[in-house]
Amino acid sequence: MERKTKDEKNLKKAKKLDSKTNRKYSSRGQMKRRIKNSKTISNVKEIGDDGLIYLKSGEVATLIEVKAIDLSLTSNHEKNLFFSMLKALYQVPNLNLKCYKLNEKLNLNANKDNLDKKIERFQNDEGKKILLEESRNLIDDLEEKNFTVSSKYFWVLIAKDTAVLNKQLDEIEDITLNIVPRIYIESVTNKLEIYKFLSNLYLTSNSLDELVWSDLPSLVSPMNMSERTDRIKFDDKEFQILTVKNVPPFVSELFFEDIFNYPDVRASIGIQECITQEELIRWVNSQYQFLLTDRNTTKKLSDATELDTQKENFQALMQDIKNGDEKIKEVSLILIVEGDKKHRDEVIRDLKRIADSYQIKLDVPRLRQMEAWQSYDISTKTFEDYCFYLPTLTLSAGFPFTKTYFNDSNGYMFGVDIHTSLPIFFDPFVLNNSRTSHNMAIISSTGGGKSYTMKKMIVNEYGRGTKIFIFDAENEYKKIVEANKGEYIDLYSKTGGIINPLQIRFIPSDDENHDTKETDCPLAKHLGFLEAFFKTAFESITEKELVMLLAIVEKLYNKKGIYKNTSINTLQNMKPEEFPIFSELYEFLPEYKKDVDSKEKEKIIEQLDILLSRFLTGTDSYLFDGHTNIDLSNDLIAFNLQELLYSGNQRLINTQTLNLLTYLNNSIVANKINNDKVKLEDRKHVMIIADEFHLFIDENNFEVLRNFGQLARRIRKYSGSLVVATQSVKDFVGSQSILRHSTAIFNNCQYQMIGMLKEDDLLAYLELFKQNPLTDTQKNFLMSARRGEFLLNIDSKNRLRIWIRATELEREMMGEGETR
């Protein structure tokens, strides 16, 4: 009752709106012609207020939208299980089902709106504005060239009356609910949506406003119609209808997929039960006799082997039919090919080539085009001579609703879906029930396109306002930083940047119920960082020395006016020069020593004097003994760590990496505090990128990996993302200790992008990601992937094969082309 009221209100609203506007509708003569043509073209009588479709032939039908399932990446076991469970749907008693694939442009309006808002937001930032405008224009260009036309799938269930219809619909809903992977269906009862479907089905050019306002299904029919020998013309649209003449009873899985989903071709599969059990057995016997004749006359061993397999299949089929486990269905496939003659000929030739590979015979029925159309229509009418019989298991194995589409409306075009050739718009900062963090792991063997992919991501994230920090292990990112006027900071030279380890860190909270606020007091957590830092800097420091050193550091902080109750808000207002440095700490030792009350403590302080003197000379001095002098205000900052990582000094590598990693927490926390003060759409994201991540492994000290693991856990709550990338995944499974710490990081990566992998790299990947295994199909893809081709794991149920593509402007901003 509520649905009826809602539809009535929508209809009245549309009529009221149209009465106030100057729209041109069909004249009375045009309407008469449409109504006359509809008697031949459409079997639809009316759309009921209950959302059902009432047919001229007396039956009633309901429209069901079906979400696609990409079976191309599932394992053989998963596919066979799916086909076996789907068989029950086709065995619903007295089933009359039409399966439709219609072409529909992807709705990218939300993508455009989001880009328009960003263009307005960055109106005064020329670099970002140019990239955003190109991204916006790219969508228009893709739409204009029909690169955004996707498949939309529907079932139309037809029954003799509403009681039978509702019973069958309940059965179908139960079956689809329990199939693995699940088929998501939705009954379409809204009149506007039903008219949209009919308009698409019948190739109409009438406006939806006119159809809804008139409430006449006959208006979806053309005004002028003519049938030729091998084609039909509706108004100014000429098209040809193809149908299947023959399908083998046992054929390769997904045999309908490529034919049914051919771009810009409408398709219909009709499924009905119209032969008795006795006729079934007679039909199987006749097919079996034909097979035996072929087997007795063949002389080729390969043919004989294939025929023997078919013979066994027929025997099993006969037994299943007798046991009631299998049924045979009458099936028809209709294809509508539009365009000029040259285009139609090319499409038909290509469709026949695809069909031949499955031993399926496609035909253009001559002098029977209108009869073929009526079989395509919503009806139970069979197309004599062009129907074929299939066991329900074979029919299930031909499941055609497989072309999925992925779109994050707030994302950027990341690449092209290899399976569907559609653009993929990706936003790593989506947050929902199945996407619970923003972290990503990018893994491929050498030459797989890992760095190119990361640069593509960096440019687009920077363009939409994300603050990006890059751990540059190979001096690969200097060009991209310079091309976008970022900051490139050397952290291993006398003239490079200094990060003072004694400047207070704002360590994010691990508590899910507590977000860091500007009123929090960070000194206690900062001392925890210094404990790890000192253990790494002084490999031989004892527990007593460490406890004493931390007590001295805290006393020095107190002398500077920093206490355990000093808030982040206060610390943010302090200048770097107001924090102590190691020379001051060293000079403070004698003062602290005066107040100790035991000889043992005096000896410990004397030992600390020796340890801390390390920070006063040599490399430690110019890396750590000084006030922080780097500026993190730029949105694109790369830290050059190449010389550090290849220095061979693992102690310095670990201490400086820890120093940098924890210092970035200040930016992460400050960004969170600022985000809490602004509107949702104005919030800023932070992305930390660590390329060549395997170079940060130290088998004797896991403090760096442990801190990366903590960051991976915490950063989600702070609008942040950690991206780790490697071309040497084997290094992460070198020992159980390394594997344990590495798994803590990689298991916190929502997204995995896996590119071309050599066999040993693939084995290492499978070991590292045991909780998220790959199917044989996915493994084969990775073993044969080309440069730039990746398997993108969105969540446990959503995996895409993506080909990374970049525009000329993007390549320029990536430092891969000439500067503007």
Where are these regions (language model features)?
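Extended, folded cores of ATP/NTP-driven motor/assembly subunits in large transport
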Residues: 2-399
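P-loop NTPase motor domains
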Residues: 51-54, 64-69, 76-94, 100-105, ...
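P-loop NTPase motor core of the ASCE superfamily
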Residues: 142-146, 173-174, 181, 440, ...
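The Walker A (P-loop) glycine that initiates the GxxxxGKT/S ATP-binding motif of P-loop NTPases
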Residues: 443-444
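Walker A (P-loop) phosphate-binding loop of P-loop NTPases
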Residues: 447
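Conserved lysine of the Walker
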Residues: 450
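Hydrophobic positions on the alpha1 helix immediately C-terminal to the Walker A/P-loop
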Residues: 453
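Conserved H-loop
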Residues: 473, 691, 717-720, 725-734, ...
